[in-house]
């Protein structure tokens, strides 16, 4: 069976990591997998093994921000991608980004493939981050009209599906919930690598993710400021992004330089995660929350915001880790202090490891294959 993974912009991130794991397993099972892209970063390519075929289409308008150039770029991509699809004749196309272009390809390609859209974020929450009411309405209108033109939608959490059904009026029967394959056993081996730029002398809280407004590091820092008034510990933040300056300013203005370390982007964050005592996710919203599962796989306790959509589902509403309401730094500080003083680490660690198996590559890929095969009956 042949399938195209349609990712016009292949960068470093959760989408790429998840799809690389699924593609690897599909190839093991005998599937013919091809990755179709327009922008291919070194980091993005590094997620995928040599066994997967990658077709990169060149256009003269790559990385252009002006609207006219973006429209021209999409038109050229449509022409070139359509030719490739007609020549290769994939049975399925799984689109992870640029859904309008994917739907246009389905409508106007000679090869009649089955189109699956992989929705990784609550579309309503994502639209609201635009900070432009008119643009928000346009995005939601387009999604409401275009999504039903696909053959199947894979939502990476129940919360994402609920939003698609309740807010965009999409038929629930065409949506399957399939979580991310975040419990990759390779992480365990990578976690054993030596760390030479940080010593874990004190109790260490770790946060891993892009430094963006979505990740809400300021709430974490406010909570941490309260925590260090009560006990000695450190905060390790791994990631890079547009909010770095604001985070650095807060650390400096609140005299936290001796307690907080920003390590920047790390290709192997798991070697730091495995040596930490606690992982905290402070996001305002998430599609899923891969790093929560990765923490559980490594036996690291988790505290997460109760944000839309994935974290509370992963933690089963607090059964496998503590939750707090977004922006509530006081509650977060209480939970951190409780975790630091907890005597049940070994038991909770074993329970978390067991829960992480629900997100194994084998189990999740099996669900993807089932979703594909349903379209052939």
Please annotate each region the language model reported.
Residues 5-13, 17-21, 25-69, 160, ...:
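N-terminal strand-loop element at the rim of the active site
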Residues 31-32, 206, 212, 217-262, ...:
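A conserved nucleotide-sugar
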Residues 95-101, 119:
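Short His-centered aromatic/hydrophobic patch
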Residues 104, 148-175, 182:
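A short, active-site helix/loop in glycosyltransferases that binds the activated sugar's phosphate group
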Residues 265, 284:
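Aromatic "clamp/platform" in nucleotide-sugar-dependent glycosyltransferases that forms part
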Residues 301-305:
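Short hydrophobic beta-strand element within catalytic cores of glycosyltransferases
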Residues 317-329, 338-343:
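Conserved acidic donor-binding segment of nucleotide-sugar-dependent glycosyltransferases
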